[in-house]
């Protein structure tokens, strides 16, 4: 009996751990989880900050004055969206709203005027976060009104020019919340995404689910404990990036139909 006990390997538990009684692995996983959740919350909630970036205030002020001068007569009543939403350019209720790939909303006419103002040779930077705007999502249905048709035409023209630009990994991560929100919204809407794209998303989600429940892992939980879940989160994160890339390609291809 004694010989068997002496032959067994001895693994000290929590020796020299940062917090007594708590494994260092648990502490690392908890800290990384807080960082991941905090980053995700920042990406999702930063859209509520509608303050113009200091470097763009002069340009936005000039565009605002230009829009006010062009409106010699009061504009006719137009449908309003997001009753609690104010366009940061014209400081009025958002009408015919559009959303940029970074998740900020503007009046369609305001963001188009901001693009046309000055001598932009490429894609504009968001007036709020200064992220490069490569996609403009109209958030209204086309109507017979001339303003509506003009804004849709300008948005399509802008997307054709800049939606296919190369994107860095950080840009793709910053675009993730907006693209995923639009992708899943169209996925579950009638007449949204075509079936092949929906099938690809479902297969990707099933593949991620099988990987999460599979005992075969790059970092096995049985050996590394809670740290073994890091590869599962990493695979899921890569999957979300891949879905956003696919959706961007679908939006780009749709422009040339």
UniProtKB/Swiss-Prot annotation:
The keyword Transmembrane applies. The keyword Endoplasmic reticulum applies. E3 ubiquitin-protein ligase that plays an essential role in stimulus-induced inositol 1,4,5-trisphosphate receptor (ITPR) ubiquitination and degradation via the endoplasmic reticulum-associated degradation (ERAD) pathway. Also involved in ITPR turnover in resting cells. Keywords: Endoplasmic reticulum, Membrane, Metal-binding, Transferase, Transmembrane, Transmembrane helix, Ubl conjugation pathway, Zinc, Zinc-finger. GO terms for biological process: protein ubiquitination. It comes from Xenopus tropicalis (Western clawed frog). The lineage of its organism: Eukaryota, Metazoa, Chordata, Craniata, Vertebrata. InterPro entries: DUF1232 (IPR010652), RNF170 (IPR038896), Znf-RING_euk (IPR027370), Znf_RING (IPR001841), Znf_RING/FYVE/PHD (IPR013083), Znf_RING_CS (IPR017907). One of its GO terms (molecular function) is zinc ion binding. Its main location: endoplasmic reticulum. The gene is rnf170. This is E3 ubiquitin-protein ligase RNF170. A zinc finger (RING-type) spans 87-130.
